[in-house]
């Protein structure tokens, strides 16, 4: 198992010497925690069949008492995806953004030791992934003996986009802890605004580079953090 303390201490040292940051906005985000700011966008609304959309996430790291930008990513969503039962809607775009972010973070060597805070302005996504997914799982276990699905809404209809929700829940279980925070949209949270902007750009097909190469802060180019366990050194890649 990788030594996450080594990873964290190296990042704290690195960021204390260089790199701009943003003050944390939530007191329960602790040193070394990863923050995942997400947003989804669709051409239709949550009740209509979408024809396409966008999903984006921004990763930050709490180090030295400051929230530091790590990387951002966005993609255009195709309504033909097997993940989407009814095309791309706002609701499934919001969950796909979280799915993409967790999928990226699970590639880290320290994923199983990491606490991830997911910030979303979607009450639906936060409620589904922090509460209802557990209700449906318990119901499914109870229904196994009679070969019925436990993934049903209160009105008896199947849960929409169940495959996407199940896959996102699978990713959640890789980490030590995943904590969800519902934030107000367009309320001045910098990284939430950035994710919202990227999702809209991706939805409109205007994003040529999914790694959002145009992002900058304090006249510095966006950087992706890489930690080499062999050398114990931090490496930054500019886009």
Annotate the PLM regions.
Residues 193-201:
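Short, surface-exposed amphipathic charged segments that create phosphate/polyanion-binding patches used
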Residues 140-151, 200-217:
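Acidic, His- and aromatic-enriched active-site or binding-groove loops in soluble protein domains
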Residues 56-57, 169, 215-217:
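Conserved "HGTGT" condensation-loop signature of ketosynthase/thiolase-family condensing enzymes
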Residues 43-45, 80-84, 98-193:
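RNase H catalytic domain
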Residues 2-92, 96, 104-107, 201, ...:
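RNase H-like nuclease fold core
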Residues 206-239:
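Flexible, low-complexity interdomain linkers flanking nucleic-acid-processing modules
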């Amino acid at each position: 198992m990788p030594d996450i303390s080594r990873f964290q201490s190296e990042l704290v040292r690195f960021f204390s010497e260089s790199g701009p940051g943003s003050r944390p906005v939530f007191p329960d985000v602790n040193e070394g925690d990863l923050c995942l700011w997400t947003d989804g966008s669709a051409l239709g609304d949550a009740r209509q069949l979408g024809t396409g959309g966008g999903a984006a996430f921004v990763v930050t790291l709490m180090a030295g008492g400051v929230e530091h930008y790590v990387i951002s990513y966005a993609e255009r969503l195709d309504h033909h995806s097997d993940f989407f039962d009814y095309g791309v809607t706002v609701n499934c775009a919001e969950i796909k953004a979280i799915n993409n972010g967790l999928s990226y973070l699970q590639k880290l060597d320290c994923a199983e030791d990491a606490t991830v805070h997911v910030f979303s302005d979607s009450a639906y996504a936060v409620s589904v992934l922090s509460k209802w997914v557990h209700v449906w799982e318990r119901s499914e276990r109870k229904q196994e003996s009679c070969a019925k699905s436990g993934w049903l809404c209160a009105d008896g209809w199947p849960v929409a986009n169940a495959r996407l929700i199940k896959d996102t829940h699978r990713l959640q279980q890789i980490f030590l802890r995943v904590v969800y925070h519902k934030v107000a949209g367009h309320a001045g949270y910098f990284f939430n605004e950035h994710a919202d902007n990227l999702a809209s750009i991706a939805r409109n097909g205007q994003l040529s580079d999914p790694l959002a190469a145009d992002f900058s802060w304090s006249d510095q180019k966006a950087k992706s953090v890489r930690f080499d366990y062999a050398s114990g050194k931090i490496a930054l890649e500019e886009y």
